[in-house]
């Protein structure tokens, strides 16, 4: 797409998402925004201070290792749901979908809302395995595809920043297992914050 086409597509999808949010507010659907991120065992520096001209050093022994985070934001419920792994592959995203089966999927004798999940066109979302997994859930899960170059349309991006800048920042983790546990604890704290304080996602960025 050329520049004008991209802008038009972003506007079109942005309007569709406004309509989806209205549907969620009316109780007609559950609206989920999905994406991946990662955290490192070395410190994430949300902010730092040093005298002018000083060489700022942060202790970070060894080689930094990462933990991948697969997540969805329940837009109306304001809840972040995260699974962790050592990689960001289609199989890891499908594991997240399997968790959504338990939380949002059909259950015998229970009426559940249709679910709309917002996804970008990243390779793990458009692989054959992932598309097959999404197709198998098409009777209750609808995908809204984001255009390329439009992270601003994915509401989970702000929450990822909040998680890393306010809950995981300025810490060194001894190994991926310790970081993994810290991620899940941080998600629990963040969700508690967001349930108590409706404007917490509007705080000033670090």
Feature roles, as predicted:
Residues 28-29, 156-206:
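C-terminal anion-handling pockets and recognition modules
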């Amino acid at each position: 797409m050329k520049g004008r086409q991209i802008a038009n597509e972003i506007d079109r999808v942005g309007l569709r998402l406004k309509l989806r949010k209205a549907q969620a507010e009316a109780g007609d659907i559950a609206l989920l925004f999905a994406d991946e991120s990662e955290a490192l065992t070395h410190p994430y520096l949300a902010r730092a201070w040093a005298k002018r001209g000083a060489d700022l050093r942060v202790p970070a022994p060894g080689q930094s290792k990462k933990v991948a985070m697969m997540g969805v934001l329940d837009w109306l419920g304001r809840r972040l749901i995260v699974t962790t792994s050592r990689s960001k592959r289609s199989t890891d995203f499908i594991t997240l979908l399997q968790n959504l089966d338990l939380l949002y999927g059909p259950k015998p004798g229970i009426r559940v809302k249709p679910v709309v999940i917002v996804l970008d066109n990243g390779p793990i979302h458009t692989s054959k395995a992932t598309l097959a997994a999404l197709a198998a859930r098409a009777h209750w899960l609808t995908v809204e595809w984001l255009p390329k170059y439009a992270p601003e349309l994915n509401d989970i991006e702000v929450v990822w920043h909040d998680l890393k800048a306010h809950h995981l920042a300025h810490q060194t983790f001894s190994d991926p297992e310790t970081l993994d546990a810290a991620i899940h604890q941080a998600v629990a704290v963040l969700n508690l914050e967001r349930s108590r304080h409706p404007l917490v996602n509007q705080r000033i960025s670090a």
